[in-house]
Amino acid sequence: MPIKIPSGLPARDILDSERIFALEKPEAERQRVRPLKLVILNLMPKKIETETQLLRLISKSPLQVEVDFMKTSTHEATHVSADHLVKFYETLDAFKDNYYDGLVVTGAPVEHLDFEQVDYWDEFKQILDWASTHVFSTMYLCWGAMGALNYRYGVRKELLPEKLFGVFPQYLQDEYCFLTNGFDEICLQPHSRLAGVNEGDIAHNPELQVLTWGPKSGPGLIATRDFSEVFALGHWEYGKYTLAEEYERDMKKGMTNVPFPENYFPHDDPKLEPLFAWRAHANLLWRNWLNWVYQTTPYDLSEVPQLREEKRLGTDRSIRHEPGSPRVDAFTPFSHDGYGVIRG
C-alpha cells in the first residue's frame, strides 16, 4: 500500500529513487480504489494443489483481489474431476471480453517437448495475444515463462544435460527494482525442470532485464522494461513438501537415475524435515507484484488497449545494471554451511 506524506517532503525524492510508492496529499485525494482482478491460467496437472499454492501467496497482500480460473479447451485435464473444472474454470471464450489487472500463467510438465508438440500450444499463443490487449500485467511461471519468452521475444528453450532439481541461490541484480524491493542480496528459489532459456537471447533483447540470476540455475526472474510481463523460471509458489513429494513419487515408480533434490534436506538426508528456505522471498515477490499492479493499473481497465498502444502503461524504469550481465562479482556463494543450503 502507498504511504501518504506531506507535500514537498524532502524524503519524497529518496523514496522515489528506491521505488517506494508515496503519495502527497493531493495525489492521495485523487486516487480511486477498487479490487484487483486476476485470472489464473492453470496448466498444472494437480489443479487444486496449484490453486492453493497461488492463492496462499496472493492472500498475503492487504489488497482485495478477485480471482478467476482459466483452462485450455484443447487439452483435457486428467488429474482433477470434471465437476471441479465445470464449477470453477472457464476457457478463453468466456473471458475474451473481460479486462484484468493481472494474469498468472502456471508451468506445466512439458518442458522436454518442442513447443509445437504441446497440444495446446496454439491456444496458449491465442491467450497471450488476448492478454496483450486485455491484461495490465502478466506473471509467467516455469514452462509458462519459457513459452511466453519464446513466443513474445524469440528466446530459445534449451534442454538441460540433467534435471535441475532442488533449491538454488539467486543473486539480486538491483535492490531497488519494484519486484525485488526488500529482497536479500542472495535469495533461494526452488527449481524442478528439464529445460532452461538461452541467456544470450535475453542479454541481446533490449526489452528484457534479468532481475535475479544464479550460477547453476541461471536467470530466475526476468521482466520486461515496463514490468508488464514477469517471468519466473523457478517455483517460488511451491510449498514446503512439494519437492519431497516429487522425489518420492519418482522413486516409487522405480525410475532410474532419479535426481536428488539439492540444497533441500538438511545434510542431504531425506529422512529429515526439508527446509522451507524460500517462503519469505516468495511472499515478498507476490506482494511487490500486486502492489506494483495496484499502483500503476488504470482504474478503468477498458483503457488498457489504448494505453498499451500508446506505450503509456507500466513503469518503464529499468534496473541499474546492464540486462543480461549478472552481478555476481561482489558475492561469494556460501558452501558447506552444515545444511548445504546455498551450494550452486
From Swiss-Prot:
GO biological process terms, semicolon-separated: L-methionine biosynthetic process from homoserine via O-succinyl-L-homoserine and cystathionine
Pathway: Amino-acid biosynthesis; L-methionine biosynthesis via de novo pathway; O-acetyl-L-homoserine from L-homoserine: step 1/1
Keywords, alphabetical: Acyltransferase, Amino-acid biosynthesis, Cytoplasm, Methionine biosynthesis, Transferase
Gene3D superfamilies given in the database record: 3.40.50.880
Binding, substrate: 163, 192, 249
Domain of life: Bacteria
Gene Ontology MF, one: homoserine O-acetyltransferase activity
Amino-acid biosynthesis listed as a keyword: yes
Matches recorded under InterPro entries: Class_I_gatase-like (IPR029062), HST_MetA (IPR005697), MetA_family (IPR033752)
SUPFAM superfamilies for this protein: Class I glutamine amidotransferase-like
Enzyme Commission number(s) from the entry: 2.3.1.31
A Pfam entry, by short name: HTS
Catalytic site positions: 142, 235, 237
Coarse class of the protein's main subcellular location: cytoplasm
Localization of this protein: Cytoplasm
Statement: the UniProt record of this protein carries the keyword Glycoprotein: no
A single Gene Ontology CC term: cytoplasm
Catalytic reactions of this protein: L-homoserine + acetyl-CoA = O-acetyl-L-homoserine + CoA
Site features described as Important for substrate specificity, chain residue numbers: 192
Annotated site residue numbers, Important for acyl-CoA specificity: 111
Entry similarity comment: Belongs to the MetA family.
PANTHER family: HOMOSERINE O-SUCCINYLTRANSFERASE
Role description: Transfers an acetyl group from acetyl-CoA to L-homoserine, forming acetyl-L-homoserine.
Protein known as: Homoserine O-acetyltransferase
Organism: Bifidobacterium adolescentis (strain ATCC 15703 / DSM 20083 / NCTC 11814 / E194a)
Lineage summary: Bacteria, Bacillati, Actinomycetota, Actinomycetes, Bifidobacteriales
Gene: metAA
